[in-house]
């Protein structure tokens, strides 16, 4: 499963055949009938954050968005954030989200592992895409 490109897991889950893997991810009890609220357990968040798929696609997605911006409206950090939100979450960032992302991109570009100039920008943008791929609105169907 580690190499899978599919981010959904389907199990048959009944009172007689409980899948123990689901206990790690806050399983729904099959003997109860109730409306489930949003929940997350630390293991679920860590599985998503450390997913090889997310790590592998963050840089190519960031590069794609950058190329789109270079051909259209100009390649600024603000434009990148807006396009990344639109592309990955199908929504625009709120003003506080936009400001937080701008500040965070700036901080990531200053990290020693970011490199210099274009490499630092690419590093920071890939990190932002990685964050958005782990955003609740990315992997939850409402």
Region locations from a protein language model:
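An acidic, gly/pro-interrupted, aromatic-rich
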Residues: 1-88, 92, 132-142
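Hydrophobic (often cysteine-bearing) scaffold residues that line and stabilize catalytic clefts
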Residues: 54, 77, 81, 97, ...
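Alpha-helix boundary/capping detector
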Residues: 71, 110-111
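Amphipathic alpha-helical segments that form the core helices of the histone-fold
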Residues: 99-110
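Intrinsically disordered, low-complexity Ser/Thr- and acidic-rich flexible linkers and loops
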Residues: 113-117
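Globin-like tetrapyrrole-binding proteins
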Residues: 128
């Amino acid at each position: 499963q580690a190499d899978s490109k599919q981010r959904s897991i389907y199990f048959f889950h009944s009172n007689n055949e409980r899948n123990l893997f689901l206990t790690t991810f806050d399983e729904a009890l099959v003997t109860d009938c109730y409306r489930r609220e949003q929940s997350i357990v630390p293991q679920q968040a860590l599985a998503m954050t450390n997913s090889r798929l997310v790590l592998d696609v963050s840089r190519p997605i960031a590069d794609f968005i950058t190329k789109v911006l270079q051909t259209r409206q100009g390649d600024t950090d603000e434009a990148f954030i807006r396009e990344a939100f639109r592309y990955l979450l199908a929504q625009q960032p709120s003003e506080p989200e936009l400001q937080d992302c701008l500040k965070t991109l700036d901080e990531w570009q200053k990290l020693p592992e970011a490199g210099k100039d274009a490499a630092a920008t690419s590093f920071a943008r890939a990190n932002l895409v990685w964050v958005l791929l782990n955003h609740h609105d990315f992997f939850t169907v409402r």
